[in-house]
Design a protein with these regions (language model features):
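An extracytoplasmic/periplasmic, membrane-proximal ligand-sensing/linker region
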Residues: 187-230
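Short helices/loops that flank or line small-molecule/ion binding pockets
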Residues: 54-59, 76-95, 108-109
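Short, polar/charged alpha-helical segment
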Residues: 47-66
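Bacterial signal peptide processing site
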Residues: 21-25
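Short helix-initiation/N-cap motifs at beta->coil->alpha
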Residues: 65-85, 102
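C-terminal motif of bacterial Sec signal peptides marking the signal peptidase cleavage site
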Residues: 15-20
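A bilobed periplasmic-binding-protein/Venus flytrap-type ligand-binding module shared by bacterial periplasmic
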Residues: 168-186, 206-207
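Short, well-ordered beta-strand elements
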Residues: 33-47, 66-71
Length: 230
């Protein structure tokens, strides 16, 4: 089993204020924000989600925005549904989710249909993580999003290990950022797509271990930013 450190535990271990532990209040960000100020939200149940949020945040900074990452405390109790709601209601601008979990929350009937289809097609050896299944679940998730919400390209890497108690179906769980559609232009979306296309499981595991070792997500991922020209 991989080591996981919750956001709260990491903040306590640091014993100092870090960017994700003590950001400006969410309401303040919404008050002072404009199109160039973006809030990236994530489920703070483990460091991997924080790492992903900071990667997407940095890509938006590079695209000319002032972006912040913000841990969504509601998602600790309410799961990824709280992240989706925060985008739909305009409390955040970008959220890090996963395709299967998002689809099951947004359109349970379609999620069940696809899960049964994959199981029937492959029986006990069904590969729900095949490229075909991944693309089909992503397309269904995009179709299920509210009309004011859009999605960047999914990563080939899966996440949302902590959604097991929230979702019941065997579906691909590819990492994907969703966002408020009117706020991001083509260039911004390409910036998100770059991160999705670049990140892989080995990278995430290494960054996760490094963040725990250094007790700092920002310090762990800074070399990755530079090496990958984010």
């Amino acid at each position: 089993m991989r080591r996981r450190l919750s956001l709260g535990a990491l903040c306590v271990a640091l014993s100092v204020c870090t960017a994700a532990c003590s950001q400006p209040a969410q309401g303040l960000l919404r008050d002072i924000g404009d199109r160039d100020t973006l809030l990236v939200t994530f489920n703070p149940v483990d460091t991997e989600n924080w790492i992903l949020a900071e990667l997407y945040q940095t890509s938006l900074d590079s695209a000319g925005h002032q972006a912040y990452s913000h841990d969504n405390n509601d998602s600790v109790r309410q799961g990824y549904a709280a992240l989706i709601r925060s985008i739909r209601e305009g409390d955040a601008d970008v959220a890090v989710v996963c395709t299967g979990t998002a689809l099951e929350l947004l359109d349970p009937a379609k999620a069940k249909e696809l899960s049964e289809k994959f199981a029937a097609k492959g029986g006990q050896t069904a590969d729900v993580n095949s490229g075909e299944a991944r693309d089909e679940v992503y397309a269904a998730m995009v179709a299920s999003l509210p009309e004011t919400v859009a999605a960047a390209n999914p990563s080939t890497t899966e996440g949302c290990e902590n959604s097991a108690g929230e979702t019941m179906l065997e579906l691909p769980q590819n990492i994907v950022p969703i966002f408020r559609k009117h706020l991001l232009d083509h260039h911004d979306r390409q910036s998100l797509n770059k991160v999705s296309g670049m990140i892989n499981r080995a990278d995430l595991d290494e960054l996760d271990d490094k963040a725990i070792e250094l007790q700092s997500v920002s310090s762990a991922i800074k070399p990755y930013f530079i090496d990958n020209d984010i």
